[in-house]
């Protein structure tokens, strides 16, 4: 199988040297991601495209899913690549691919040509289109809004017959821009904000301020791992977890109630700035949106930003909440956010919407900054690729098994699409299906006398979900790895 990768348009208008550098980086990124599951993946670089090929047709569906989620790809074409002798040979090859699919359909032929030939692109379109109309049971040629558009590309003596066109995610290739540190809470906003910078070519590292115990951290790790594995797996990134409960306790004791929200955000920015300094990251990313909550007025954001010299990037600053939720649904983080509790909102009962810097600084004078320094010094840094292994070592009581006992039930927690593509069949046993994003609410309704073995393809999500359920007090759960 072969695919032609078309570059994001903003790449094509760069200078020659920048374009070559971006294209070469995209080539490496595609190769890195595809070889996670197919070592035979090949990626060849041309001036205006990349050509991806593999002999392993069994990975076709994974190629389609993966290529659609790599930054820098505007769209990609499934192609049949061959040589040709003349116009009639091109027609015959095109009819072999498209003939049956044109039955009863209106169509047109669009051709793109590079190199020296004894025919023009228009002549190629007319010859092949006329031949298909004459020799196939079509509903006729329609140049505007046809049922099917047959796309051909001729490059010197090579013919590319395009059988399907798929949209990519656009943006710049990963690591063509500088790194950023995203303050990830697990909610709708921070996940979408992180995605925006992945798409723009930044390596997005994650900083998590834990306000809700192990369950909160497990939930946010799931979001970070999902974003990385889905859209950014070509490069390693770091996940930083900071226990912020001591900071919250100090704020509750020492800071005026109305100023608590702004002071908390300033403490988070201070801590994130130190983490960014440690990893030499020049910018922070948040999901803040002007006016969405009390701490996100322009006055308050200005006061919050004063505590760090890092650039604080807010890609959602003017987005409406319904648009953020819609984008979260599109990229796949909605289900995580819907089950993630909001911890920051309980801090202040009557929050200020126009913080005065001098008043905030006076309140912070009562704060013991040794507490902030301590929680940052004790921060835990994790290569996001190791999340599954780290969680397994962290909580020893989660049992993994490949053998089923009589009272054990297999619980497939994959999404419906993953399940349908690769069904789990265990001879003589039924398999229950509850997607991971519904497990937190649905698990308590299952019969408690049975033990449930959670299953997913790689074992990472099932391990994280088992940890979450253990934290909630459910002991009748294991991980199934056949």
Curated annotation (Swiss-Prot):
The keyword Cytoplasm applies. ATP binds at residues 183-184, 265, 287, 296. One of its GO terms (cellular component) is cytosol. It catalyses: [ThiI sulfur-carrier protein]-S-sulfanyl-L-cysteine + a uridine in tRNA + 2 reduced [2Fe-2S]-[ferredoxin] + ATP + H(+) = [ThiI sulfur-carrier protein]-L-cysteine + a 4-thiouridine in tRNA + 2 oxidized [2Fe-2S]-[ferredoxin] + AMP + diphosphate; [ThiS sulfur-carrier protein]-C-terminal Gly-Gly-AMP + S-sulfanyl-L-cysteinyl-[cysteine desulfurase] + AH2 = [ThiS sulfur-carrier protein]-C-terminal-Gly-aminoethanethioate + L-cysteinyl-[cysteine desulfurase] + A + AMP + 2 H(+). Coiled coil: none annotated. The active site is at residue 456. GO terms for molecular function: ATP binding; CCA tRNA nucleotidyltransferase activity; tRNA binding; tRNA-uracil-4 sulfurtransferase activity. Pathway: Cofactor biosynthesis; thiamine diphosphate biosynthesis. Disulfide bonds join 344-456. Keywords: ATP-binding, Cytoplasm, Disulfide bond, Nucleotide-binding, Redox-active center, RNA-binding, Thiamine biosynthesis, Transferase, tRNA-binding. PROSITE patterns: RHODANESE_3 (PS50206), THUMP (PS51165). It comes from the Bacteria. InterPro entries: Rhodanese-like_dom, Rhodanese-like_dom_sf, Rossmann-like_a/b/a_fold, ThiI_AANH, ThiI_fer, ThiI_N, THII_Thiazole_biosynth_dom, THUMP_dom. It is found in: Cytoplasm. Residues 61-165 form the THUMP domain. GO terms for biological process: thiamine biosynthetic process; thiamine diphosphate biosynthetic process; thiazole biosynthetic process; tRNA 4-thiouridine biosynthesis. Residues 404-482 form the Rhodanese domain. Its EC number is 2.8.1.4. It is an enzyme of class 2 (transferase). Belongs to the ThiI family. Catalyzes the ATP-dependent transfer of a sulfur to tRNA to produce 4-thiouridine in position 8 of tRNAs, which functions as a near-UV photosensor. Also catalyzes the transfer of sulfur to the sulfur carrier protein ThiS, forming ThiS-thiocarboxylate. This is a step in the synthesis of thiazole, in the thiamine biosynthesis pathway. The sulfur is donated as persulfide by IscS. This is tRNA sulfurtransferase. It comes from Aeromonas salmonicida (strain A449). The gene is thiI.
